[in-house]
């Protein structure tokens, strides 16, 4: 029985005719409960694979009024990571993937308060220049004047020694 299941899984994967992007970037567990903490989630379009793990170096970061951090991540130079960026990332975000850890700062935008109410995040944002491994939901932010791709919400950020 186990052998037959393994064969079926193998055939299903092999029949696609291409290697799955999800397996190339080593996707892990994404915490779905964090979506309750996303301000205006309708602006975010989940992409495939929806849960990804990437590596790169922390760049510019700043706090946002919705309580989120905005972090630019310079992805490691792996060919598969280049596919994660679009033109808006290249032009408006200096070629970086955006990370959006949710509710990590005080919310100052009145209509965003409810998303972070009674929530204490467990994430620590490493300093600029730190090499990290990041897991979270891969999305495109379709808010006005955005259009770039992000990991939002971020499930984990781990420094790489």
Where are these regions (language model features)?
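Sec-dependent signal peptide recognition
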Residues: 1-8
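N-terminal secretory targeting signals
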Residues: 10-18
């Amino acid at each position: 029985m186990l052998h037959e299941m393994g064969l079926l899984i193998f055939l299903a994967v092999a029949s696609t005719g291409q290697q799955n992007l999800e397996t190339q970037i080593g996707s892990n567990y994404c915490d779905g409960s964090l979506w309750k903490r996303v301000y205006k989630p309708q602006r975010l379009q989940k992409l495939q694979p929806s849960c990804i793990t990437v590596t790169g170096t922390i760049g510019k970061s700043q706090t946002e009024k919705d309580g989120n951090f905005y972090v630019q991540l310079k992805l490691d130079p792996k060919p598969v990571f280049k596919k994660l960026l679009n033109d808006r990332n290249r032009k408006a975000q200096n070629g970086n993937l955006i990370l959006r850890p949710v509710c990590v700062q005080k919310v100052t935008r009145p209509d965003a308060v409810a998303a972070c109410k009674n929530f204490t995040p467990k994430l620590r944002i490493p300093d600029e220049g730190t090499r990290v491994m990041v897991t979270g939901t891969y999305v495109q932010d379709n808010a006005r004047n955005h259009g770039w791709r992000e990991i939002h919400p971020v499930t984990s950020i781990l420094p790489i020694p």
